[in-house]
Structures are given as C-alpha cells and as structure tokens.
Swiss-Prot record:
Keywords: Cell cycle, Cytoplasm, Phosphoprotein. Positive regulator of protein phosphatase SIT4. Involved in directing expression of TOR-repressed genes and in dephosphorylation of NPR1 in response to nutrient starvation. Negatively modulates K(+) efflux of the cell by the Na(+)-K(+)/H(+) antiporter NHA1. Associates with the SIT4 protein phosphatase catalytic subunit in a cell-cycle-dependent manner. The keyword Cell cycle applies. This is SIT4-associating protein SAP155. It comes from Saccharomyces cerevisiae (strain ATCC 204508 / S288c). The modification Phosphothreonine is found at residues 613, 618. InterPro entries: SAPS.
Length: 1002
C-alpha cells in the first residue's frame, strides 16, 4: 500500500468493488451454467503470452489455459478455480461483507452511493440472497466503470485486473442472450455517442472542463449515475428485476458532470445537456483507447472491425471543421495506434482503398493533414512501409492539383492544399535535416514530372489569382528542397550498374526549368497586363500619394523568376550530359516498373508456371539492365555522342567574351540553364522589373526579390555561360539588342513580329543600371528628403545594388567581357558616385549607433571604441594619450596636451552625436554643390568666361548693416576671445610673412 496521501480518492472510487461484483457474478454463472464456464477460458486465455513485469511496456503476464484462470491482482494466485469453488465463494462473501460495512455499498448492478443516500429498501435488496442468471451479467458493470473518476488513473497505474476487465471482460445481451465483449461494447458506445452529436457548434470545447477535474471539484455529486444507451434503456424497460438500479439512476446526478435535468426543463435545454453528455462519454472512451498501454492497443489493432469503426468517424457529417469535437477524438485514438502499434496499424491503412479520398475530403483541417503527413513519413528509405506506393497508386498528387482551380475551390482550400504539398516537399528534401525526413520519393518525382509541371504552368497562366499564388509557392519549395548541388549522389558520377534507378533517386529539375523557360514570355505578359490594366483602382498611402498597387500576382511571378534563376545556376542544369543521363535513368526506371507489374501478373496465373520458368521477367530485366549498363557506362565514362541530346558544352571562347560568334554558339542547342537565361535576356524582364522597383519605393518585399535577381546575375559565371550577356543587358540595353536574334527589329509587313514591340519603340531602349537606376534612385530620394526630411524606402537596396556593381567592376577585368561595360563604368558621373557619394554612404552606414569608431584590439579583431569624455591626468600633469579626443574623419587630435587647458567641448559633442541620415544628406548636398560649381568653373575657363560677381544690392547692404548692428553686443561681450583670435591671426600673418621672406631669399 502506498503511503503517499495525495492523488488518491479511495473513499469515492468503486473500481475494486465493481470488479469484485463482476467476478462474483461470473463465478456463480460458471458454477451454475456450464456454457459460461466454457466461455470464460476462451475470453481470458486466448491472449498472447504475458510477462511477469508490472510495466505494460513489456508483454503482460500469462494466463493459464484449461479449467483455471489466473488473476493478475496483487498476490492472488487465481481469480476463480473450479476445484474449490465453494471455498472461494465463502471467502468472497466475507470480503464483500467487510467492504459493505466500510463503504455501505453492496449493489451488484449499480455504482456505490454515499451512506446517507441509502434507504432500507436498498440495503435489504443488497443483502438479500441473489439468484444469479445471465441477465445479471449485463452491461451495467462496464457502464458503472465509465463513470468512475479514477478510471483513467487506475488504467495509467496499470491495474491488471481492471485491464483484464476492459480488454477480456464480457457480458450477455438481455435480448439475444449473446455474449458481448467489453471492448466491442466500448467501440459501439463510442460510435453511438458520436452519432448523437448533431452539430459540432453546440458544444464549446474550450469551455468543456476535463472530466476528471470536474468530478473531483464537484463534491456534491458523487453518485454513480451514467448516461444510458438506447439499448440499455430498452432492456431495463423489459426487465423488472433491475427496477431498483433504474430507480437509483434516476435519483442521481449527471454522470459526466452535467447539471441535474429536471422534468420541468425545456426540451432544448435537455437536448443540449444530452448532447454534452454524449460528447463527454465519447471523450472518456477515446481517452481509454488512446492510453499508451500495450494490452488496450493490441486489443484494438488485432480486430479489423474495431479499426473500421474507429476510422469511420472521419466520414461522420459533423467531422467538417477544425472546431469539430470529433477531430480530437479521432486523432487521439489513431495517433496513439500509429505510435504504439505502427506495423499493425499501417497494415490496416494499406487495406483502405479510399485512404487518400478520406484525407483530402478534409484538407482544410490542418491537424488531420499533419496526421496524414505522419503516416507518409513512416515510409523511409532505410525502413519502407509501402505507404508512399499506396498514396501514389491512389493518385494523391493529381488529386491535390485538381484543387488548384479558382472556379471549383475557394482560396482558403487552395492555400491548405498548397501548405500540405509544401510540407510533403519539405520532408522529401534531397538533404535530410531531421528524423521526419524521408528523402526523394515517387510523390515528389511525380510532382516534378513533365506532366505535372505542364499542369502547374497552365494553372498559373490561365487561372491566375489565388491559384497562381499557391502554385508559385509550391514550385518555389520544390526547387529549394531539391537543389542538385546538395544531392548525396552526384548524377554525373553514377551508372546504372553502381546505382540502379529507383524512386528514391534525387529529383532532376531539368524538365521543370525547361518548361518554365519556354513559357517565360507568358509570365512576363502577366506583369504587363496588370501594368496596363486601367480598371485597377489607385490607392493612397500615408503621405497622401496616389499609386497603383503592385499586387500579389506580379510579386509572385517575379519571385518565381528569381527562384528559376537560382535553379538555372545549379551544376546539373548547365550540363548536357546530366540531362542525357537523367532521361536514360527515367527510361530504365519505367521499364523496371513494367517488368515488376508483369511479374506480379504472371504469379497470379498458375497455368503459366512453365512459361515463367523459361522466360523469367527477372532474367529479362537483368538482360535489359546489362544492355543499359553498357550504354550508360559509355555515357558516363566515354562521353559518346548522341544526336538527340547533343555534345557537352564548348568551353572555348574569344576576347572579348561577348561577341556574335559566342552568342550563336551558346544559343545553338543550349543547356537548360542557359536556355532560361536566353529567354530572360530576350524578354527584357529584368529591365522592366527594375523600372517597377523605382515606381514602388515602399514595398520592401518587392525590393528584396529584385535585389536577389540582380545579385545572382552579378555573381554568376562570366565564362561558358549566357550570364555575361545578362550583365551586358543591365549596363547597356541598347547595345544588347544586337544579340537578340529571336526578335525581329524591322518588318514593314508586320509579319513574324514577336508579341513585344520592336526595339525602336521599346521604352527601356536606353536603360543603364548606373544612370537609369542607381543614380536616378539617388536623385529621387534626394528630392524626397528635401521635401519630407526622410529617404525613400528603396535606398537601402539601392546601396546594396551599387555595392554589387562596384564589386563586379573590381573582381573582373570588364574590358575582357565587353568594352561597352567598361565605357559605362568609366563615365564621369559613375566615377564620382562610386568614389565619393557611395564612399560617404558606406562610411555613414558603418558607424556605430551612439558614436565611436572601430579599433584593432591587437589580435586582429576589429572592435568598437566609444569616445571617452573624461581626461585622465598623468603624474606630471599631462593628459593621457588614451583619452585624447580624435576626429574620426581627419585623424587629428583635438584633445589637450597639458593638464591646465580645457577640453574642446564642441569636438566632444561632435563625436558623441549620432550619425544620421541628415548628416549624410548634408554632406551629399555640399558635395553636389561643390561638384556643380567645379563643373561651371571648368566650362567657363574653357570658354574664356570670367565672372566678376553681381552688382551691389542696396537692400542686401542694409540687411548686412542691421545684422552687424545686432551682433555688436555679442562682439563686445567676447572681447577677450576676439583679442585671442587677433593674436592668433597676427601670429599666423607673421609666420606667413617669414615664409614669404624665406621664399624671396631663395
């Protein structure tokens, strides 16, 4: 016995008494009715071998077979034995009388009641001799057990007798007199209670108090009364012997925490209370089934009918939303079975022909879709379970894509489908990151197949709207999680012999990139259509400026282009041999699946046994593999030529790299990576979106995705790739048109003209990233600052893009790439900006917030050094060098050298002041003024013009006199300072005179 005083409620728990009553009745029936004695071993002995440990993590104790049933309670050796039935009966009667004196509860067919609730009739009925029949062994025992507050706690404590009662106990139906197992009864009661819950919204789950907590708090309601099932109510109407039990049930309070339902209450209130009671009863049963106890879960999974009934909860009408009370009931049971009895539960799942349909029918319930992903994630490479093949055969991917239809599915449903597919792609990444990862599989392979990609492209172009947004997110996730640069097996170094093709191979994205490249002009048209749509209403921002909203469609299209550009820079996308190997492996993989299907068909036909031995599909497959091995080995090792796919790229080039010969060579049978860059070059998308960059100065997401595109172009390969031509189009769009061979520049008849305007009419004809983007952005932001005292929102990304241009010009010899690029970078405007304006901006952005500078700590680390406003004096009276105030810009010392002099407070305040945008703006303004003045002076000097100055203005002279008159007082107050200044001026004058004399002397 435990001496722990808390967490126990032995006075109000009647579990042991109910068990004693049940086994007493069972013992009497066994003694009287031989048929019952035959049924007992069948129920209690047909179990798997049980271990001797009390923990149910191991197999429970073994029950003996034959004529005796061993007990698992305490130190008892047997629950009942046929050899000493009478002795056991007397012992049980003695224990029963002791329990009756302590708790004053002895009824065999109802729960315990308090001493004050019993009347003389109850006591006489309880103590009178009982004629035991099969009707006494009814469902009242299991019903009384369900209302016990300590039921779940006792099960969690692994009360073996209680577990045996739940899992192996039975009773006799009063109508049919047939035996009903307690587990079967609980499952049926669960389904009955669920069917009585008419609406999912009538019960607020957030306000539903836990059953155990409510029973412990409700001290006034301790009587064991339960919600009767319809079957039990009909049985009690027919059975007069149980009238006392029925009387006590009517007298008690609600068994599941409901208030007393008076006969005078309205029908609506009664229905609501009944519905809440049904829900609570279903919750209790689901809690029993979801306990992590081997015996309970084993009893469920070994019976197919139990699992079918539990699974049918998903098809209930009220299982229709995230807030439905049936969702947690269904998930608690099934998740526990998946966790504790995975093999048996997955065997059941594989028998469900409508598994995918059942799940997708509730795709808007995120908890259920998470459970769906958990089931799929059990099929790993090292331990396959066949679930992926199951959902693949049930067309999971194609059914998910069918939801991406604006006419048939609302936006929220499409978003849920997109989230599910993105989660599926995440756990199927080619580089596993956690335990839930399952690696590439047939599902993601189907999603990246040419058929699925064609459907996705069609959805984006024709559906647009919510379907476009969701589909773009799916494609972006597919590219990010299947980057071939992180493949665990390099496709270029594999052969069919060393790495036979399988559905677990890395996903090849070449088909995806080629399809999107061919439709890139259609995606650009989406941007143009929205730009030219006059029906889009204008919005007004906080600055009262009218603007056309960017919209999600344009943003998602450009985000897709940025991700496709990432994809085009992958290693496999720039190899012709990789595409050739991928196609060959796909062909062999499809042949293997056909051979496997043929083998399965042959095994099902007994008449073809001899034919199978002579022409074994396995041998045919091996023969094909041998032939294919030879071909693939040649592809991988000898690099043999195939006209269907072309040779590997020619890495020879001339100087400068950008020329017509190189352009024609790259455009002739390009790699899939270069194909995308060529289409991006010909459609002139980059210059258009950079124009939209400036017209939407406050959309930071838009700026970020465009900066990503520009950064990729400048950091891409400049040799053996079409990326260098993209760089040329950024610096000089006009010069780049000579290499756009796919665009007809002039055609009088108008035939063969592309959907885009000819070059002469193109508004971006003279686009240059230096003048038309960076410098223009600076100028617009400068004007805006003069008006609003704040910069435009894109200035941060403008500076980053300018830094990329400067880095590119220093990293490469641009004259070897294209002389046109060098000419642009050598212009006077750009040189002044990059050396002066950008340098000042860089210095301002690198300053520490709060002032200070960076110093070297002596170990090669650059750390911040804040200015110190104190001066530490050395013993000789001099100020320490460590506390001198240094001007971070000039490097000169503004501190004092002697202890008797004052600190320059103005210099100190300048150091302590924050570096703000205002400081930078003022510096830039001074620089621009000086720059403009220098330009004017230089031109005047060249033209021989001398500026003598404007004539004197009387008004200005009077203003100057007034100003001088007003400042007399302050000048008189500062005589000492003026004298000091005069002395300094005199000293300087004398020094200058000495210098002049020295010069004259020389």
């Amino acid at each position: 016995m435990s001496f722990w005083p808390f967490g126990q409620n032995l006075n109000h728990s009647n579990i042991n008494k109910i068990l004693d009553e049940y086994f007493h009745v069972l013992h009497e029936l066994e003694r009287i009715n031989p048929s019952v004695g035959k049924a007992i071993p069948a129920i209690f002995n047909n179990v798997q071998e049980r271990g001797t440990s009390d923990s149910l993590d191991s197999i429970p104790e073994e029950y003996s077979h034959g004529d005796e049933v061993k007990t698992a309670r305490g130190d008892q050796k047997s629950r009942f034995e046929k050899d000493d039935q009478q002795e056991r009966y007397e012992k049980e009667e003695e224990e029963r009388s002791m329990n009756s004196s302590e708790s004053s509860t002895t009824s065999f067919s109802s729960g315990s009641t308090s001493k004050t609730d019993l009347d003389e009739e109850d006591i006489s009925n309880a103590t009178a001799p009982m004629m035991v029949t099969t009707k006494n062994l009814d469902n009242s025992f299991i019903e009384r057990m369900l209302v016990e507050t300590e039921l779940l706690n006792e099960l969690s404590r692994q009360n073996k007798t209680l577990l045996d009662f739940i899992c192996f106990g039975f009773f006799f139906d009063k109508k049919t007199n047939k035996k009903v197992n307690n587990m079967e009864y609980l499952v049926d009661q669960l389904m009955e209670c669920i069917s009585k819950i008419k609406t999912a919204t009538t019960v607020d789950l957030n306000n539903l108090i836990d059953y155990q907590e409510q029973q412990q708090l409700d001290d006034s309601s301790q009587e064991d009364v339960y919600v009767e099932s319809d079957t039990e109510q009909e049985e009690e109407k027919e059975d007069d012997n149980n009238s006392n039990n029925k009387k006590r049930r009517k007298r008690g309070s609600s068994s599941f925490g409901n208030d007393d339902i008076n006969n005078n209450d309205d029908d609506d209130d009664a229905n609501e209370d009944d519905e809440s009671a049904y829900l609570t009863k279903a919750t209790i049963i689901s809690e029993i089934f979801s306990l992590d106890i081997w015996l309970i879960s084993e009893s469920l999974v070994k019976n197919q009918s139990y699992l079918n009934k539990i699974w049918s909860i998903i098809n209930q009408p009220n299982f229709n939303s995230e807030n439905s009370p049936l969702v947690p009931i269904f998930l608690k049971i099934n998740q526990n079975l998946l966790l504790t009895r995975q093999d048996q539960y997955l065997n059941f799942i594989r028998t469900e022909r409508s598994f995918v349909d059942d799940m997708l029918k509730h795709v808007d319930i995120s908890l259920l879709m998470d459970f769906f992903l958990k089931i799929i994630s059990t099929d790993k490479i090292e331990s396959p379970t066949g679930i992926i093949e199951l959902v693949y055969d049930q067309n999971l991917i194609s059914k998910c894509l069918s939801f991406l239809n604006n006419k048939e599915s609302p936006a929220d449903i499409q978003a849920c489908v997109g989230d599910f597919l993105k989660a599926l792609i995440a756990i199927s990444a080619n580089a596993p990151l956690d335990d839930i990862s399952i690696g590439p599989n047939s599902l993601t392979r189907q999603l990246a197949s040419p058929e699925s990609i064609a459907k996705l492209v069609d959805i984006m172009i024709n559906q647009r709207g919510a379907a476009l947004n969701t589909t773009v997110s799916i494609v972006i996730e597919l590219i990010r999680k299947n980057n071939s640069d992180y493949d665990q097996v390099n496709l270029l170094t594999t052969t069919i012999k060393t790495h036979p093709p399988s559905n677990r191979d890395p996903i090849y994205l070449g088909y995806l990139l080629r399809k999107f490249s061919n439709h890139l002009s259609d995606f650009f048209q989406i941007i143009l259509d929205i730009e030219n749509d006059a029906n889009i209403p204008l919005h007004e921002n906080q600055l009262h400026e009218k603007f056309k909203p960017l919209g999600f469609e344009r943003f998602k299209v450009v985000e897709l282009i940025a991700e496709l550009l990432h994809c085009s820079n992958m290693g496999l996308m720039n190899s012709k041999r990789a595409e050739r190997i991928a196609r060959r492996r796909d062909k062999v993989r499809s042949q293997l699946s056909h051979h496997l299907q043929d083998a399965l068909n042959d095994l099902s036909i007994e008449e073809k046994e001899q034919l199978k031995t002579k022409h074994s599909p396995t041998r045919d497959t091996d023969h094909d593999l041998k032939n294919n091995n030879g071909k693939i080995d040649n592809d991988n090792n000898d690099n043999d030529d195939e006209s269907d796919y072309g040779d590997e790229i020619d890495e020879s080039f001339e100087i400068p790299y950008i020329n017509m010969k190189q352009n024609i060579k790259l455009r002739t049978d390009p790699t899939v990576g270069d194909l995308f860059k060529i289409k991006l070059y010909d459609t002139r998308i980059v210059s258009k979106i950079m124009e939209l960059f400036l017209t939407h100065p406050w959309n930071n997401f838009w700026h970020n995705v465009i900066f990503d595109i520009i950064q990729q172009i400048f950091n891409g390969r400049m040799d053996f790739s079409y990326n260098s031509f993209l760089v040329l189009s950024l610096f000089n769009l006009k010069s780049s048109y000579q290499f756009m061979t796919d665009i007809v520049i002039s055609d009088e008849k108008g035939t063969d003209v592309s959907r885009f305007s000819p070059v002469i009419r193109d508004p971006n004809f003279d686009f240059k990233i230096t003048t038309d983007f960076i410098l223009r952005g600076y100028q617009d932001s400068y004007k805006f600052y003069e008006l609003r005292k704040m910069n435009l929102g894109y200035m941060g990304h403008i500076v980053l893009i300018a830094e990329e241009v400067v880095k590119f010009s220093k990293l490469y010899k641009v004259e070897l790439i294209s002389p046109d690029i060098q000419v642009i970078l050598q212009t006077e405007e750009w040189q002044y900006y990059s050396e002066e304006v950008l340098n000042e901006t860089r210095m301002m952005y690198s300053k520490i917030l709060g002032g200070g500078s960076y110093i070297d700590d002596g170990n090669g680390n650059i750390i911040p050094q804040l200015p110190d406003n104190t001066t530490v004096l050395t013993p000789n009276g001099d100020a320490s060098n460590n506390n001198e105030i240094l001007d971070s810009d000039t490097g000169s010392s503004n501190g004092t050298s002697g202890g008797g002099q004052l600190i320059n407070v103005e210099s100190l305040e300048e150091q302590l002041s924050l570096s703000t945008e205002s400081d930078l703006h003022n510096k830039l303004r001074e620089m621009l003024i000086n720059r403009a003045q220098e330009d004017v002076d230089n031109k005047n000097t060249e033209n021989g013009v001398f500026i003598l100055g404007p004539p004197e203005d009387k008004n200005s002279n009077s203003n100057i006199n007034n100003t001088n008159h007003n400042s007399n007082n302050s000048n008189n107050n500062d005589n000492n300072d003026n004298n000091d200044n005069d002395n300094d001026n005199t000293r300087n004058y004398n020094e200058d005179a000495d210098n002049d004399n020295d010069y004259d002397h020389e």
